[in-house]
C-alpha cells in the first residue's frame, strides 16, 4: 500500500520492497542495549572471559551479511523486481552454532543461561522466489562472522560507541 500511495502521489514508476533476515556485518551496532544477536555476542566474547548466552542455543534463525543485502537491493532494482523479495540465506542456523563460532574465535568458554528465554524456535525465510529470480547470497555465516570480528577488533572504540539515534537525540527533543 505504501508503494501504491507513493506512486500516486509522486507519479513515480514501480517500487521495490526487500525484506532482509537478520542482518550483520562490519559497522553494525555493538551497543549491548540495542545490538542484534551476532554483534552482541561478538562484543560479549571479546570483553569478557566467558560468553554468556541466553537460553539453550536451540533457536534457529536466518542470517544474511550486510554486503549480501546491499547486493540483493541492487539486484532487485536492476531487475525491476516489484514484488516483495526476502533477502536471507535460507539456511537454518542455530544460536548455538553462532555462539560456538564466536567463542572459538575468542578462545573462551560458553555459559548457557537457561533461566533466560531461548526465543522463538524457528524463524527462517522462504528464499524460493529469490532463488527463482537468480539471487543467492555469497558470504557464508562463518566467513561473515570472521570478517565482522576482524572489523570489531580493529575498530573497538567506534564499534562500542552507541549508534542509537534516539538515545543521541533524547536530550535535544
Where are these regions (language model features)?
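Hydrophobic alpha-helix immediately C-terminal to the catalytic Tyr-X-X-X-Lys motif of short-chain
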Residues: 2-6, 37, 41, 98, ...
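C-terminal substrate-binding subdomain of Rossmann-fold SDR/epimerase-dehydratase oxidoreductases
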Residues: 46-173
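Flexible, glycine-rich beta-alpha linker
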Residues: 13-37
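Active-site Tyr-X1-5-Lys
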Residues: 1-21, 42-48
